[in-house]
Amino acid sequence: MGKNVVVLGTQWGDEGKGKIVDLLTEHAAAVVRYQGGHNAGHTLVIDGEKTVLHLIPSGVLREGVQCLIGNGVVVAPDALLREITKLEEKGVPVRERLRISPSCPLILSFHVALDQAREKARGELKIGTTGRGIGPAYEDKVARRGLRVGDLLNMPRFEDKLRELVDYHNFMLVGYYKEPAIEFEKTLAECKEYAELLKPLMLDVTAELHDLRRAGKDIMFEGAQGSLLDIDHGTYPYVTSSNTTAGGVATGSGVGPMFLDYILGITKAYTTRVGSGPFPTELFDEVGAHLAKQGHEFGATTGRARRCGWFDAVILRRAIDVNSISGICLTKLDVLDGLETINICTGYKDAQGNAVAPTDADSYVGLQPVYEEVPGWSESTVGAKTLEELPANARAYIKRVEELIGAPIDIISTGPDRNETIVLRHPFA
């Protein structure tokens, strides 16, 4: 029998999921995205060549691997087609392997305009969205007024629905945000072009996944963003608009929880965050600058500098529970090379010194992290492929992290290339 393996982030995103998905898809027949949109930025480095993917599953660089976009993903046709073209220009065959669920909500021009208008209006209170229309598209889905990929198959009906949506959103754009109106005819013309290009890619992804499962094929489910950005379980309201935790796999693909065999949580050896929101272990000193520089901490989607801080075992324990994590992949261990001492956050205290466990953004206010200091290492870990190649203090750090989070570290990433990896227990084994 095949195995269904989920790869998801356990922090605030940018944990290095793309590399690990690419690594593990050597064993997979298919890779499926199940939530988010082109706000994701998955960076792959293969033989020194960097590729950044936003919407297409990271298995696309593996020959013969089927790439599926499940119903939980919001699809911006223009962004998807740009990504396809860019890959095809590199000689990567995409269209014959990429299939999209007709149930995927569409992101159209008015969603992007609304997203950007809202962030502009919030000023200093902005959430820090990518401004790509993700949230407004999910809102339309939940309000049951959204257009979906499959609607492009019936253009007369699509035109009627689109007119209603453009009128609805222009009312807010013009009347409240004082922004220019979206042109209906221009948007319709664009959608007609999208329809011709997307029709050959449409497929009942849920049915395909179950056919693969029954045929005994290995399937990889690729998460986007991170657990602490989950709309329900994250640091609300500084979150994304989808379920980034393991529950999103079932709803976003149609493959039920009982069919998920292994859930791999991707975790940086330190912590980063892009945009606004609480971050208890954030560093503003030379160590934070070291992590940012050595880790090349700039968002693959937005280019924004990431905030950097010490490893936080508290948020990891929460993510492990919420996702029922089977094992952890610890990434960017090499970024800690050269640090004399390293701190690990083991808890939080409020102003009165009481131990607390925050559940939303407001409950983080005023909290101080409680640190455990461990010795660092001066030797390089870059490119290590076995545990024995790591410095003794690096091995001790890994062991201590395991003890604090209560989950096994099954994979360790020691560099950006797919080959710079230590695999202690293979998820597909």
Curated annotation (Swiss-Prot):
Catalyzed chemical reaction(s): IMP + L-aspartate + GTP = N(6)-(1,2-dicarboxyethyl)-AMP + GDP + phosphate + 2 H(+)
Record text on cofactor binding: Binds 1 Mg(2+) ion per subunit.
CDD domains documented for this protein: AdSS (cd03108)
Protein residues bound to IMP: D14, E15, G16, K17, N39, A40, G41, H42, T130, R144, Q225, T240, R304
Positions contributing to GTP binding: 13-19, 41-43, 306, 332-334, 413-415
Gene Ontology cellular component annotations, sorted alphabetically: cytoplasm
SMART domains per UniProt: Adenylsucc_synt
InterPro entries, sorted: Adenylosuccin_syn_GTP-bd, Adenylosuccin_syn_Lys_AS, Adenylosuccinate_synth_dom1, Adenylosuccinate_synth_dom2, Adenylosuccinate_synth_dom3, Adenylosuccinate_synthetase, P-loop_NTPase
Cited SUPFAM superfamilies: P-loop containing nucleoside triphosphate hydrolases (SSF52540)
The protein's assembly and partners: Homodimer.
Family: Belongs to the adenylosuccinate synthetase family.
The name this protein goes by in its record: Adenylosuccinate synthetase
Biological source species: Pseudomonas fluorescens (strain Pf0-1)
